[in-house]
Amino acid sequence: MARLTVITTGGTISTTAGPDGVLRPTHCGATLIAGLDMDSDIEVVDLMALDSSKLTPADWDRIGAAVQEAFRGGADGVVITHGTDTLEETALWLDLTYAGSRPVVLTGAMLSADAPGADGPANLRDALAVAADPAARDLGVLVSFGGRVLQPLGLHKVANPDLCGFAGESLGFTSGGVRLTRTKTRPYLGDLGAAVAPRVDIVAVYPGSDAVAMDACVAAGARAVVLEALGSGNAGAAVIEGVRRHCRDGSDPVVIAVSTRVAGARVGAGYGPGHDLVEAGAVMVPRLPPSQARVLLMAALAANSPVADVIDRWG
């Protein structure tokens, strides 16, 4: 019988509607696992009860520390219940900083615990099954959601009526038992602290945008800025000039990385503005959404790794 630890952090999976109709975390871990009828020895750690929009990088460290404590206590696998708003960031940070062999599986819900057809119990049951499965060993951090097992790298939240929750690279399925059908990339960068990682900001690009927001981020201490660019990685002349100032002309160059506001799109320098961004000193992040490009840059800078090499390998 597998020994598993469930670490709760809040999120929709733990929420119910109050008298005012507002959803807030109310369910503890013991309530979440009640009635799941799992053939495992399950310990619960109620770490937080937060909407994931309130989480900070310091909370990623708290979650990572709780995972390590569970493994020191003899857990064979860990499941983390998490809000879907920022699950893609937490999952990637953990994957970038966890080198262990025992599985860490994140899950959550699209519907509150008191909603008709709530998806939380099934998602949690599936995540526990993945964490207990010998095939998940040595895969590091996984996401189990909506009947699928997903790789954290490249994951992004989507709104679908089938409650799948996320788009990303599928590693397998959980319907009718756990089936892992693909190998997984483990983008480990080191045992890093998110709370002390260099500041990385995200700046939106839009018609008529200029470099004011980028300048403000750099003035506030950002070591890197992710541009949420247009299309396949494009921006106007004022933004390109701002990139040149910060990457080429300054005495203390800043990393400017280019992602896109188009969900699931690949970024490249195929169009004139994208080509000009690269010539100005920006680096393209071909596959990651802005949220995850930021996390990857935080980890790369914290590890003192060459950013271009890290992006070329995992971005």
UniProtKB/Swiss-Prot annotation:
Optimum temperature is 37 degrees Celsius. Shows maximal activity between 30 and 40 degrees Celsius. Its main location: secreted. It comes from the Bacteria. Optimum pH is 8.0. Retains about 40% activity at pH 5.5. GO terms for cellular component: extracellular region. Residues 2-315 form the Asparaginase/glutaminase domain. Its EC number is 3.5.1.1. PANTHER family: 60 KDA LYSOPHOSPHOLIPASE, L-ASPARAGINASE. Belongs to the asparaginase 1 family. This is L-asparaginase. It comes from Mycobacterium tuberculosis (strain ATCC 25618 / H37Rv).
